[in-house]
Curated annotation (Swiss-Prot):
Keyword ATP-binding: no
Job of this protein: Multifunctional enzyme that converts the viral RNA genome into dsDNA in viral cytoplasmic capsids. This enzyme displays a DNA polymerase activity that can copy either DNA or RNA templates, and a ribonuclease H (RNase H) activity that cleaves the RNA strand of RNA-DNA heteroduplexes in a partially processive 3'- to 5'-endonucleasic mode. Neo-synthesized pregenomic RNA (pgRNA) are encapsidated together with the P protein, and reverse-transcribed inside the nucleocapsid.
Organism ancestry: Viruses, Riboviria, Pararnavirae, Artverviricota, Revtraviricetes
Gene it is expressed from: P
Priming of reverse-transcription by covalently linking the first nucleotide of the (-)DNA, annotated site positions: Y63
EC numbers: 2.7.7.7, 2.7.7.49, 3.1.26.4
Protein name per its UniProtKB record: Protein P
Note: Hepadnaviral virions contain probably just one P protein molecule per particle.
């Protein structure tokens, strides 16, 4: 006869009808009883021949692939001009007393952050943008490239200019060794070189003169080719021109894919550049020099675009032009869907490349990428904006994987001990928190992203395209890329991006200037940074509480008026050091804080309502008597495990599911087991804050008996059969709780102290979790345990009762200073110029 739900509840001692605990509870440790119950509940994981169920509600399992959905209307989020101040430590010391060693150590970790993996694999640029959406290849390419350019303009990325140089926007840090302008400019004046000639897009450095070192040249001259005006006007090559010609004709094009001109300019170069770069042309004293405007630190740098040296000579030999996009301009349309129709829409398509405001020297950076990128929805609640996903998983795989540092994550009890109070709360939203932390330029070659340019990208992902590497840029295969799909996509994208289509069609290689989200080091660094900042805030306002986990930052104060003043002071401090807050997303919670998926109040902690609704929907759609794929069970356990501490039986109730996942077998929910779990999760109990106190109840056990010391009273008992020592100790703790009602119990068993009952017999673990719920344990050595003698049958001997205090722990998550003692008077308004008379003493 199958085990009914009511009988199962009585078996677990969850009803008040159970007999004496000392008789009933040891039975639950019996191995035969556990096997019989598991068999009655169909928990034995049989090899069923019925097909497995691979989908339950929103949970999918094996052999099910979620087709990603591309949104053609995705918006690229805007990023503020984030620049964390380099004198962060000094500003913190001005805000509060001298920083502690812990605070200084944590802040130095991120000023700047460093990342040096054991080995780095480099991939071709063709793999820079992942073909995540095969039906929307072109749209995805341009939206991803636009996202990358947005990050570069927002000071988050470096742009690779050459093998040893990069450019970026925004204010430089001291560790970013800037390459200065040379002493010669186009007008022959010495100074900043506002008209200095840069070497097209690559930014390759000119060779230093004889007698100087490479290092000194890097410090003295800015990127670019430095010629005198006379040499340019006469079209002659001086000594520097010969050096440039010999050194800077690379076998591999600087930008990684497309050839760009680095030769000397003459009339042919003038005609080719004026034909292909119809952006704002600036002609100085030399009328034969045609340039297009770039972006440098002065805003007036000149970009020289010429044909490769091999083509300079006679026009009869033909020219291999550097810009794939603009080659269509002077060709005959091949069809109604020829790309030349789009290119002829505009006279001025803008520059082929953009340069940053500053140029720096970098370690050797190949024209490759180390991780692919693609776009997804920003979050399940915001599908209008996109989020860039960067795949740097190579650093977490293989024999050369990086061992990421571990950091403290607050568990539920520590979080409740710390935040469960009668304070008023608010939470702050840090804009793009990861992108606040600067990365040392030496890490750039390990964190490269980019794209190979539209022509090569379309050729790789399209089976109909016939662009081959050795033919790239030749007129014979130019029109092979023309197709109806590409034509229609570009025509629609033209309405969004306009002439930027030309810029985005070129290859680009970018390295991270701020820490990326796709590397395991980033969460550690962000946690260290925010915890140090909160520690500074706590010491500046000892009467308040500031706490953070990753980018979630919360502030608490005794009254709403006080919280408003605290909010103003803290936000001003954070803004003064360069931390950007999204004030529109500041949430005022009142006395019930919403944090990390929990609701935390003075009464304790409960899961948030949206999680409770997910659990209800899960049980509503959970089938019975059908084998469910273990991968689906894994997802179900992930949801139920979050709320397990708030149920009667806790994690032990989920142990049959854990066993099926470990064995990679299907699991069949019997009606009784489903009803048991459903009842468990429909009635959630808050996890209460632990209170300090004095331990006056002690428990101890041997394999054959148990003993208790409750005040000056001693008790003992024996087991029917010898039990494992850990099981006996757990039973003794349950007896102590049942007989005394004390919420602080002393024991000498480390397993009982850990409060992890999943390794005990299943039925005993479920019952013990409910009996010991809300109980705090204190470790007492066996030699000093007053219950040691009773457990061995010696009631006549009474050891003196220990005065063993219990202090609630917050683990390694709290780094605040104790507040000074204060009277109970509470002023109506807080003035930060004088000490506050009302303080909250943390636990």
């Amino acid at each position: 006869m199958p085990l009914s739900y009511q009988h199962f509840r009585r078996l677990l001692l969850l009803d008040n009808e159970a007999g004496p605990l000392e008789e009933e509870l040891p039975r639950l440790a019996d191995e035969d009883l556990n096997h019989r119950v598991a068999e009655d509940l169909n928990l034995q994981l049989p090899n069923v021949s019925i097909p497995w169920t691979h989908k339950v509600g929103n949970f999918t399992g094996l052999y099910s692939s979620t087709v990603p959905v591309f949104n053609p209307d995705w918006l690229t989020p805007s990023f503020p001009d984030i620049h964390l101040h380099q004198d962060l430590i000094q500003k913190c010391e001005q805000f509060v007393r001298p920083l502690t060693k812990n605070e200084v150590r944590r802040l130095k970790l991120i000023m700047p952050a460093r990342f040096y993996p054991k080995a780095t694999k480099y991939f071709p640029l063709d793999k820079g943008i992942k073909p995540y959406y095969p039906e929307n290849v072109v749209n995805h390419y341009f939206k991803t490239t636009h996202y990358l350019h947005t990050l570069w303009k927002a000071r988050i990325l470096y742009k690779r200019e050459s093998t040893h140089s990069a450019s970026f926007c925004g204010s430089p840090y001291s560790w970013e060794q800037e390459l200065q302008h040379g002493s010669t400019s186009l007008n022959g004046e010495k100074g900043h070189g506002t008209e200095s000639l840069c070497a097209q897009s690559s930014g390759i450095l000119s060779r230093p003169p004889v007698g100087s070192t490479i290092q000194s040249k890097f410090q003295q001259s800015r990127l670019g080719l430095q010629h005198k005006q006379g040499q340019l006007a006469n079209g002659k090559q001086g000594r520097s021109g010969r050096l440039w010609s010999r050194v800077h004709t690379p076998t591999r094009w600087p930008s990684g894919v497309e050839p760009s001109g680095t030769g000397h300019s003459d009339n042919l170069a003038t005609r080719s550049t004026s034909r292909f770069h119809q952006s704002e042309v600036r002609k100085e004293t030399n009328p034969s020099l045609s340039t297009s405007k770039g972006h440098t630190s002065t805003g007036h740098a000149v970009e020289l675009n010429t044909v490769p040296p091999s083509t300079v000579g006679s026009e009869s030999q033909g020219s291999v032009f550097s810009c794939w996009w603009l080659q269509f301009r002077n060709t005959e349309p091949c069809s109604d869907y020829c790309l030349s129709h789009i290119i002829n829409l505009l006279e001025d398509w803008g520059p082929c490349y953009e340069h940053g405001e500053h140029h720096i020297r970098t370690p050797r950076t190949p024209s490759r990428v180390t991780g692919g990128v693609f776009l997804v929805d920003k979050n399940p609640h915001n599908t209008t904006e996109s989020r860039l996903v960067v795949d740097f998983s190579q650093f977490s795989r293989g024999t050369t994987r990086v061992s990421w540092p571990k950091f403290a994550v607050p568990n539920l009890q520590s979080l409740t001990n710390l935040l469960s109070s009668n304070l008023s709360w608010l939470s702050l939203d840090v804009s793009a928190a990861f992108y606040h932390l600067p990365l040392h330029p030496a890490a750039m070659p390990h964190l490269l992203v980019g794209s190979s340019g539209l022509s090569r990208y379309v050729a790789r992902v399209s089976s109909t395209s016939r662009i081959y590497n050795h033919q790239h840029g030749t007129l014979q295969n130019l029109h092979h890329s023309c197709s109806r799909n590409l034509y229609v996509s570009l025509l629609l994208l033209y309405q969004t991006f306009g002439r930027k289509l030309h810029l985005y069609s070129h290859p680009i290689i970018l390295g991270f200037r701020k820490i990326p989200m796709g590397v395991g080091l980033s969460p550690f660094l962000l946690a260290q940074f925010t915890s140090a900042i909160c520690s500074v805030v706590r010491r500046a306002f000892p009467h308040c509480l500031a706490f953070s986990y990753m980018d979630d930052l919360v502030l608490g104060a005794k009254s709403v008026q006080h919280l408003e003043s605290l909010y103003t002071a803290v936000t001003n401090f954070l803004l003064s050091v360069g931390i950007h807050l999204n004030t529109a997303k500041t949430k005022w919670w009142g006395y019930s804080l919403h944090f990390m998926g929990y609701i935390i109040g003075s009464w304790g902690t409960l899961p948030q309502e949206h999680i409770v609704q997910k659990i209800k929907n899960c049980f509503r759609k959970l089938p019975v008597n059908r084998p469910i794929d273990w991968k689906v069970c894994q997802r179900i356990v992930g949801l139920l495990g979050f709320a397990a501490p708030f149920t009667q039986c806790g994690y032990p109730a989920l142990m049959p599911l854990y066993a099926c996942i470990t064995a990679k077998q299907a699991f069949v929910f019997s009606p009784t087991y489903k009803a048991f779990l459903c009842k468990q999760y429909m009635n959630l109990y808050p996890v209460a804050r632990q209170r300090p106190g004095l331990c006056q109840v002690f428990a101890d056990a041997t394999p054959t008996g148990w003993g208790l010391a409750i005040g000056h009273q001693r008790m003992r008992g024996t087991f029917v059969a010898p039990l494992p020592i850990h099981t006996a100790e757990l039973l003794a703790a349950c007896f102590a709780r049942s007989r005394s009602g004390a919420d602080i119990i002393g024991t000498d068993n480390s397993v009982v102290l850990s409060r992890k009952y999943t390794s005990f017999p299943w039925l005993l673990g479920c019952a013990a979790n409910w009996i010991l719920r809300g109980t705090s344990f204190v470790y007492v050595p066996s030699a000093l345990n007053p219950a040691d003698d009773p457990s061995r049958g010696r009631l006549g001997l009474c050891r003196p009762l220990l005065r063993l205090p219990f202090r609630p722990t917050t683990g390694r998550t709290s780094l605040y200073a104790d507040s000074p003692p204060v009277p109970f008077h509470q002023p109506a308004r807080v003035h930060f110029g004088s000490p506050l008379h009302v303080a909250w003493r943390p636990p």
